[in-house]
């Protein structure tokens, strides 16, 4: 019985590989993103059709997929809102990839996850990483460029003063008083 299932899985895998052959280049590009396996890349291509020209921007793709933040505003007050409904297969595959990316070491996506999870919670951080991945996929599919990771220290390099203040604040909460002197 197990041998029959293994044979069926092998036959389906072979058929998927044959059907994905026209999208081999896009599949390889998508797999350069940390956390994305060939299975997730296949789901992304299958659900979007592999043609990103249908979506005018990455934001349109994210909204269609259901990983764009919801909006609930009344009388100038912004309230909590859920994400928009979208493609459940694509959201599921991206969720698995986002969780895998959040556990990778030294990547921008992991830094983004931990930065948002500490403030907003783990589920919102997963959705934010899903959107970042989908934006990267749209950009790679439209330009043909490979994924270039910004690095885990991206936010520190972007705003070094903020990182310095946060480190000082953390030391002060531990009971230390720090006097900064420029290095000579």
What are these regions, as identified by a protein language model?
Residues 1-184:
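A detector of single, family-specific signature residues
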């Amino acid at each position: 019985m197990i041998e029959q299932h293994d044979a069926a899985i092998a036959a389906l895998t072979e058929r998927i590989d044959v059907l994905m052959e026209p999208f081999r280049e896009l599949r390889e590009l998508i797999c350069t993103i940390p956390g994305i396996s060939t299975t997730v890349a296949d789901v992304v291509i299958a659900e979007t059709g592999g043609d990103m020209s249908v979506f005018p921007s990455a934001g349109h793709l994210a909204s269609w997929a259901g990983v764009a933040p919801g909006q609930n505003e009344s009388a100038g007050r912004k309230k909590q809102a859920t994400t928009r409904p979208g493609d459940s297969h694509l959201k599921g595959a991206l969720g698995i990839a986002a969780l895998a990316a959040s556990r990778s070491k030294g990547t921008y996506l992991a830094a983004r996850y931990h930065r948002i999870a500490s403030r907003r919670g783990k589920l919102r951080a997963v959705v934010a990483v899903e959107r970042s991945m989908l934006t990267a996929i749209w950009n790679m599919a439209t330009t043909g460029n490979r994924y270039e990771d910004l690095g885990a220290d991206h936010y520190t390099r972007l705003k070094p003063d903020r990182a310095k203040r946060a480190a000082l604040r953390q030391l002060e909460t531990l009971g230390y008083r720090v006097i900064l002197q420029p290095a000579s």
